[in-house]
């Protein structure tokens, strides 16, 4: 075994024959061959390195590979196994070496060349010491940091890291991403800088060419994290799908300007195609512009700008249709702006602005979820303060809020009051076991078609906390005062009214624990009884306006609320005692809550009740309906979520919901949920009143593998009272065995109005560590199928497991 160490311009040769010393050197080499050292453990490059071809591997999309990993294997690059050498030294280890000092060295057999972070394995190498250049063949493997290059012939300058190789296979790993390529030639242009010609590349496992990009040339710069391809075609399953004369892409997953993958879908409005372009304007500023075409509607232009600074951040979005062919409307748009500014450690401000061109915008361009959630669009500016004052905590907020209210299909809109402005202040201070506090709120309400005015609410209170490890008692005394100054409106005169109500309540509870075995393991089970007494005297409030109060549905949480109305315009009368008990099951090792269930009821000592119109009525009763719930995991596979509101006087359920989910493994989900309501708010009628009716819905959904690679996704949501499905969704997803790609196709039909539906068909193609084509299925499936995971994510997760 021969070795060479060099440091330009000084050369120190050990065991290398020069002139008359060859015989002695041969003797040393022979002795080392008979007595191997650690350096001789280097394996011959000619044995493990297979002949290189210009193919990434198999292009078969549906080939079976039970291991889920590539079949093609190659030996790793081997070092000399000797002690480290100083920086900028070059070491050559081989079976045989000959040459002339400071001129050129010829090395053959198990050649290993090492310099700094570069290691070269090859069959033979010519080393030019004056130029610090090595020429290698017939096969070589060059390892440098996260880059591995294999090929047939190589000319390489070790100092400048420049050179050229032929019939090359390259693998680059950076930022958790893997890029592999095969090329006719590869030029090394400096550290981490390469130019490849006649190349194919992808981000799959070795031997997997289910998809790849074929290009006349690719220039990759690891320092900049950018690759540029010229005359490139996207090949899927061996078939060219898309061509571009120029394209660039990130090597490390960082953001960069350029075309994003187009999005294609089909539905009730025809085929839609969007081609977005991304602008990486600065590390903290970017933008996206996406021109689109919707078959039956025409051209659409989408734009988005995002910004991020240490003290503020925000995002603005704009969608514009110059002319909607289907509706005949011009200049349809949607605009959004969200901004948050941290002015100081105690002061924050923000903007939330939303606007659309017309009331039908969401019905025409969105699904039923977005339609229901965007009736009143916020346009709000706010300023919040959180700090200390007078020995206690002080929180204050100033906001202005005005809505854009969209009309329903009948043309009616129920517009809320605008807050012009609202100022809220809350101060609290702990003194021993007591806490004193006061909350105040001033609001100027504004409305175009109703009497408006100003309201001041002041609510001082004091509460005590007597608690220990097994229980607590928390009394509270408060005085709720409300003052109104109402403006003249039509025949309604301007006036001032007020209301003052004392509020007294006592909250108490206890916790009992025991260790037991349940669900196949050690758990901690609790039993937690709770009593809540609440007193508020009856007072007629029909002379007060109703700016923002609404009824809350009766459930387990309502047993422990002071006021059963939302808002401050209505305060219920109360002389009642709530009694409830809940039990929780905690993991014995981690303390994580796995399951909880509870049941409770309210007992009334008076029949008075304040109605939503402010009048005081009588409700003969001595106790409320029963409310109960149960939710959590049963074992490791089942999830339960249920609740019920039971009217014991009429012996019937007012509403209930029962849901169960079976999840034996990722990608295997079965969900079933039934919801019933005897008298539920269904929709807003044209006269401004709500239509109430029985609600009875069944929601079934699933994601389940049909084969090792193919999964089905379905949802069926049926309304029994309407006697029609609310939403139907079906899809099929495929994941490649090695996790290189995943694809899905989905069809959906859903209700958008009382007698209207929309249809949609969309597809997705996810490419490992590169991009996605089409819509991201998770955007819709997360809601449609609880527990859903994309096929590509599932495949990637499986590949990560040992």
UniProtKB/Swiss-Prot annotation:
It is found in: Cell outer membrane. It holds the Pfam family LptD. Transmembrane segments: none annotated. GO terms for biological process: Gram-negative-bacterium-type cell outer membrane assembly; lipopolysaccharide transport. One of its GO terms (cellular component) is cell outer membrane. The keyword Membrane applies. InterPro entries: LipoPS_assembly_LptD, LptD, LptD_C. Keywords: Cell outer membrane, Membrane, Signal. Component of the lipopolysaccharide transport and assembly complex. Interacts with LptE and LptA. Together with LptE, is involved in the assembly of lipopolysaccharide (LPS) at the surface of the outer membrane. This is LPS-assembly protein LptD.
């Amino acid at each position: 075994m021969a070795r060479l160490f060099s440091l330009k311009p000084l050369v120190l040769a050990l065991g290398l024959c020069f002139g008359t010393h060859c015989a002695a050197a041969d003797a040393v080499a022979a002795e080392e061959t008979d007595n191997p050292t650690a350096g001789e453990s280097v394996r011959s490059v000619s044995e493990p390195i297979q002949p290189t071809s210009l193919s990434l591997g198999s292009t078969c999309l549906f080939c079976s590979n039970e291991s889920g990993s590539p079949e093609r294997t190659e030996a790793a690059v081997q070092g000399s196994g000797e002690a480290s050498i100083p920086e900028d030294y070059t070491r050559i280890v081989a079976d045989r070496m000959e040459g002339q000092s400071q001129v050129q060295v010829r090395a053959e057999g198990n050649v290993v060349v090492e310099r700094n972070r570069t290691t070269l394995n090859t069959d033979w190498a010519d080393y030019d010491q004056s130029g610090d250049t090595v020429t290698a063949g017939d096969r070589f493997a060059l390892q440098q940091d996260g880059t591995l290059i294999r090929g047939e012939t190589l000319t390489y300058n070790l100092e400048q890291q420049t050179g050229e190789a032929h019939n090359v296979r390259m693998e680059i790993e950076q930022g958790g991403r893997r890029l592999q390529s095969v090329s006719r030639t590869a030029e090394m242009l400096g550290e981490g800088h390469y130019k490849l010609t006649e190349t194919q590349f992808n981000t799959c496992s070795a031997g997997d060419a289910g998809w790849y990009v074929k290009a006349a040339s690719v220039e990759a710069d690891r320092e900049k994290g950018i690759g540029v391809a010229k005359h490139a075609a996207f090949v899927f399953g061996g078939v060219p799908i898309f061509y571009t004369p120029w394209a660039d892409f990130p090597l490390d997953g960082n953001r960069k300007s350029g075309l994003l993958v187009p999005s294609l879908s089909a539905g009730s409005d025809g085929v839609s195609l969007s081609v977005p372009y991304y602008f990486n304007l600065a590390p903290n500023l970017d933008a996206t512009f996406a021109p689109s075409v919707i078959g039956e509607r025409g051209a659409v232009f989408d734009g988005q700008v995002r910004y991020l600074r240490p003290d503020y951040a925000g995002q603005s979005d704009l969608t514009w249709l110059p002319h909607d062919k289907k509706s005949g409307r011009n200049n349809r748009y949607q605009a959004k702006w969200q901004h948050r500014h941290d002015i100081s450690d105690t002061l924050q401000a923000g903007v939330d602005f939303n606007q659309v061109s017309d009331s039908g915008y969401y019905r025409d361009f969105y699904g039923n979820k977005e339609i229901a959630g965007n009736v009143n669009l916020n346009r709000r500016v706010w300023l919040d303060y959180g700090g200390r004052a007078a020995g206690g905590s002080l929180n204050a907020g100033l906001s202005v809020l005005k809505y854009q209210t969209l009309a329903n299909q009948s043309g009616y809109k129920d517009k809320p009051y605008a807050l012009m402005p609202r100022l809220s202040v809350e101060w609290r201070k702990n003194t021993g076991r007591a806490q004193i506090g006061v909350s105040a709120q001033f609001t100027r309400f504004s409305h175009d078609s109703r009497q408006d005015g100003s309201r001041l609410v002041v609510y001082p209170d004091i509460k005590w906390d007597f608690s220990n490890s097994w229980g607590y008692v928390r009394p509270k005394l408060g005085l709720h005062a409300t003052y109104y100054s109402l403006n003249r409106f039509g025949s309604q005169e301007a006036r001032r009214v007020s209301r003052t109500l004392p509020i007294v309540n006592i909250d108490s509870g206890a916790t009992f624990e025991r260790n037991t075995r349940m669900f196949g393991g050690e758990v901690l089970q609790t039993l937690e009884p709770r009593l809540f007494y609440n007193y508020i005297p009856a007072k007629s409030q029909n002379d007060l306006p109703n700016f923002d109060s609404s009824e809350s549905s009766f459930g387990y949480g309502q047993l422990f609320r002071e006021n059963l109305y939302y808002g401050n315009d209505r305060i219920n009368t109360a002389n009642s005692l709530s009694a409830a008990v809940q039990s929780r099951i905690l993991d014995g090792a981690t303390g994580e809550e796995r399951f909880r269930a509870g049941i409770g009821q309210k007992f009334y000592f008076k029949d008075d009740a304040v109605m939503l119109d402010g009048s005081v009525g009588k409700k003969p009763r001595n106790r409320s309906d029963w409310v109960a719930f149960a939710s959590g995991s049963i074992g490791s596979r089942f999830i339960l979520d249920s609740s019920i509101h039971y009217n014991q006087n009429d012996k019937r359920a007012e509403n209930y919901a029962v849901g169960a989910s079976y999840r034996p493994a990722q990608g295997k989900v079965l969900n079933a949920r039934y919801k019933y309501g005897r008298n539920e708010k269904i929709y807003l009628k044209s006269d401004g009143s709500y239509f109430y009716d029985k609600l009875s819905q069944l929601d079934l959904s699933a994601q389940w593998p049909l084969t090792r690679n193919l999964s089905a996704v379905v949802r069926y949501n049926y309304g029994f009272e309407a006697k029609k499905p609310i939403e139907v969704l079906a899809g099929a997803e495929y994941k490649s065995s090695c996790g290189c790609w995943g694809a899905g196709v989905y069809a959906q039909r859903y209700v958008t109005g009382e007698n209207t539906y929309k249809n949609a068909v969309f597809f997705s193609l996810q490419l490992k560590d590169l991009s996605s084509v089409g819509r991201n299925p998770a955007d819709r499936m997360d809601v449609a199928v609880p527990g859903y995971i994309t096929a590509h994510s599932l495949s990637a997760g499986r590949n990560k497991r040992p």
